[in-house]
Design a protein with these regions (language model features):
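Charge-rich (acidic/polar
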Residues: 2-5, 12, 16-216
Length: 216
């Protein structure tokens, strides 16, 4: 039984790869020329998490989307590398040029994705690129403060989405989390001004988590 399952699995994988390899050349070319092959493979693996999430990895659309995401990572690397080079002689100019290129290429990236994906699918790509922090943080906030009003939930989500838009352009996972950290601080200040005692809310939340057998 186990042997048959393994054989069927192997056959299915082979079949999918055959389909993938028989697909026409993707319209979007991978901007890998002149780049370290190991780095390219790392970026491909990272980007494929998004196409896997969308269930399109072994399709022509999936290959184009994969290349768009890979090329975005390559572009970000190029922008930040140029910034670091210019910064040695002119820090102000380096940051200004970096911000300008990030802004212009940001919307180009989303426009490229929109050629193949629906808006909600593009959101999934953004979530994969930012480690699903929007969902995790939003659910944690709602779980911590069950009495949140609908308008407060909407404001929290709006800020998290705004943070995600900035975080997808950040140069590293650390920088991405720093972006979200700033917005989490904004959310905490907002809730405090709304009259919530966050210390008490957090302590009560921890107790509820322990009571249901969860871990903090």
């Amino acid at each position: 039984m186990v042997k048959n399952v393994k054989m069927n699995y192997s056959a299915n994988v082979f079949y999918l790869k055959e389909i993938f390899n028989s697909n026409p050349e993707p319209a979007v070319k991978l901007d890998s020329e002149g780049r370290d092959p190991q780095y390219v493979q790392t970026i491909i693996a990272r980007s494929q998490k998004a196409t896997d999430e969308l269930g399109i990895t072994w399709t022509p659309i999936g290959q184009n989307v994969l290349n768009i995401i890979c090329n975005r990572y390559f572009k970000l690397n190029d922008i930040y590398a140029e910034r670091d080079s210019i910064k040695k002689t002119d820090k102000k100019l380096a940051e200004a040029q970096c911000d300008s290129k990030l802004y212009r290429s940001h919307w180009g990236f989303l426009a490229d994705l929109s050629m193949y994906l629906k808006p909600q699918e593009i959101d999934k790509v953004k979530d994969v690129m930012t480690f699903d922090v929007v969902r995790v943080t939003y659910e944690a906030q709602c779980d911590m403060i069950p009495t949140l009003m609908e308008s407060e939930k909407q404001q929290i989500m709006a800020w998290l989405i705004e943070a995600r838009e900035l975080a997808i352009d950040a140069e590293s996972s650390k920088k991405k989390h720093e972006v979200f950290g700033k917005y989490k601080g904004r959310i905490n200040n907002y809730l405090s001004k709304r009259g919530y005692d966050l210390t008490k809310e957090r302590e009560a939340w921890y107790e509820r988590i322990k009571a249901r057998g969860g871990q903090i």
